[in-house]
Amino acid sequence: MDKRFLALLAAFGATSIYGLNHTIAKVIMPFYIGANGLVLLRVLGATLLFWGIGYFFPKEKVDRSDWGRIFIAAAFGMCFNMQLFIKGLSLSTPINSSVIVTLTPVIVLILSVIFLKELITPKKIIGIALGFAGAITLILYGNSFTFNAPNIPLGNALMVGNAFCFGVYLVMVKPLALKYNTITLMKWMFPLGVLMNLPISISEFSEVDWMGLPWEAVWRMGFVVLFTTFFAYLLNMFALKEVPPTTIGVFTYLQPLIAIIYASITGNDQMDGIKTLAAILVFGGVYLVTRKPKKVMSKEKKHQFQ
């Protein structure tokens, strides 16, 4: 099977997990575990899982020159990104958060322009403006209070920060993904994430009544650790070996659709006019940013028939 197709399938799988996670993780906060405590649970669980399966893979030495990039990638991907996402989700709603994270491909493009010196077209500038307009609409005009969403504007703002950090993570980790085995990277990045999150999260983590948790909380925590953290990061890293960060970012299109369907079915959120407008602005912006120029598309088609 074509490696690129498998990479796109992996990116789709990771995005589908993230889409479900907006509602699944939302339900357990703060009733069973605080936002910071959940982050520590994620990185601890993923560390154990990656080191566990690491025994079945050949050991790989990491070059000393790459540790700086690994540290930065871990900081943005396993600490800042997770803290902002979980805290933002605890304050906002599943649909709001899923719409805002679709800014990721726009942010990845901006970072690519800065670090890779890529050219940016007027169409992409318009797309960036539309995307941020959608995010600002949610931040400024979202309802000020909803059940289990005590501070929606602040939560939405934190989700924008999350999208930025995840974009930085994708750009920073791409060269590493091409050089090292996926398990090798995850084995070292998640323990770094544990050390970074420990001072912030240990208090809430220790307050959890682990023996008294109902099944409703246990399976949701298990989903967040096993699927949202272990499998999602594994799938994204696999995809990065074959496709650029901007391509993976495009798959965040699907997160709002998946989140809206699941949240509506479970009664955890509902769509309204403001959210619809914001979604249209964000989708329109991301589409303009990520759409290939006609010249490139025509060249690709011509190459297919040669």
Predicted regions: what is each one?
Residues 3-8, 32-36, 40, 62-68, ...:
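Juxtamembrane helix-entry segments on the extracytoplasmic side of multipass membrane proteins
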Residues 30-80, 107, 165-172, 186-205, ...:
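Transmembrane alpha-helices of multi-pass small-molecule transport proteins
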Residues 17, 21-22, 51-101, 137, ...:
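Specific transmembrane alpha-helical segments of multi-pass solute transporters/efflux pumps
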Residues 49, 53-59, 104-129, 133, ...:
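C-terminal transmembrane-helix exit sites in multi-pass transporters
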